[in-house]
């Protein structure tokens, strides 16, 4: 029996507003996060991911108040990330109503933080977010490098090997964003998505690049992702979550 696949709208939040950019730049306002989250809950989204996109850069904590407001009005699992650096940060977010917490930059600086967090709170609520950029030349086998600080800083780390290490340390899920594809609407980077999905036993969420419903299907059927994340196509009304679920189900994908 195939595990049901998930559709996860993503809210990139900057100063309390949902925004959407292209390749991590050129930001456009999409509205109030709580209102948008409530709409996706009503539409039947499986989960919501809330990323405070400037928290790591500005070195400030994720807005707990927004998370509390969202959690009080949204009744599907909520993953929150951005500026998560300590066990106390995780505890604060879980207490505010997050179901899972996403760790990105802090995992690179201190990989053992992931293990400590998983030991303390359980792997099921620890998501490691990976921002990957293709670094192999045309014709070479695919190689992808990890970037941190909202995609600003290269690390020299190989994305596939890093994902395997995060799984070994206790991450319960990988949120994989292709920086090359982010916001450009030409589909996920299926190469890195498949490489990481096939290397791991834990779920992989594909992110970065959805422009139509076929891209969601490709992420699952070709990228082997367990869940597909999208932002622009839902935020700006091009498609609804029910339309996406119906499209995927019609292609034989088992949906929740």
From Swiss-Prot:
Its main location: cytoplasm. Pathway: Amino-acid biosynthesis; L-histidine biosynthesis; L-histidine from 5-phospho-alpha-D-ribose 1-diphosphate: step 5/9. The keyword Amino-acid biosynthesis applies. One of its GO terms (biological process) is L-histidine biosynthetic process. IGPS catalyzes the conversion of PRFAR and glutamine to IGP, AICAR and glutamate. The HisF subunit catalyzes the cyclization activity that produces IGP and AICAR from PRFAR using the ammonia provided by the HisH subunit. This is Imidazole glycerol phosphate synthase subunit HisF. Its EC number is 4.3.2.10. The active site is at 12, 131. It is found in: Cytoplasm. It is an enzyme of class 4 (lyase). It comes from Stutzerimonas stutzeri (strain A1501) (Pseudomonas stutzeri). Heterodimer of HisH and HisF. The gene is hisF. It catalyses: 5-[(5-phospho-1-deoxy-D-ribulos-1-ylimino)methylamino]-1-(5-phospho-beta-D-ribosyl)imidazole-4-carboxamide + L-glutamine = D-erythro-1-(imidazol-4-yl)glycerol 3-phosphate + 5-amino-1-(5-phospho-beta-D-ribosyl)imidazole-4-carboxamide + L-glutamate + H(+). GO terms for cellular component: cytoplasm. GO terms for molecular function: imidazoleglycerol-phosphate synthase activity; lyase activity. It comes from the Bacteria. Pfam families: His_biosynth. Keywords: Amino-acid biosynthesis, Cytoplasm, Histidine biosynthesis, Lyase. Belongs to the HisA/HisF family.
């Amino acid at each position: 029996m195939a595990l049901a696949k998930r559709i996860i709208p993503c809210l990139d939040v900057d100063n309390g507003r949902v925004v959407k950019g292209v390749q991590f730049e050129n930001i456009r306002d999409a509205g109030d996060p709580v209102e948008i989250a409530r709409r996706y809950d009503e539409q039947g989204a499986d989960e919501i991911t809330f990323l405070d996109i400037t928290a790591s850069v500005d070195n400030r904590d994720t807005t707990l108040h927004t998370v509390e407001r969202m959690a009080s009005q949204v009744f599907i699992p909520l993953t929150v990330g951005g500026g998560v650096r300590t066990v106390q940060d995780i505890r604060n977010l879980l207490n505010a109503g997050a179901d899972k917490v996403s760790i990105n930059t802090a995992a690179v600086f201190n990989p053992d933080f992931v293990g400590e967090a998983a030991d303390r709170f359980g792997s099921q609520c620890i998501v490691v977010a990976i921002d990957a950029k293709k670094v192999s030349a045309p014709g070479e086998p695919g190689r992808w490098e990890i970037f941190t600080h909202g995609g600003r800083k290269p690390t020299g780390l190989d994305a596939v090997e890093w994902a395997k290490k995060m799984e070994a340390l206790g991450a319960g899920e990988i949120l994989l964003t292709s920086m090359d594809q982010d916001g450009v609407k030409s589909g996920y980077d299926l190469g890195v998505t498949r490489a990481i999905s096939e290397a791991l036993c834990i779920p992989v969420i594909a992110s970065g690049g959805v422009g139509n419903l076929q891209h969601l299907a490709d992420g699952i059927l070709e990228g082997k992702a367990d869940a597909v994340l999208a932002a622009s196509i839902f935020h700006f009304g091009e498609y609804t979550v029910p339309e996406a679920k119906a499209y995927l189900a019609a292609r034989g994908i088992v949906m929740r």
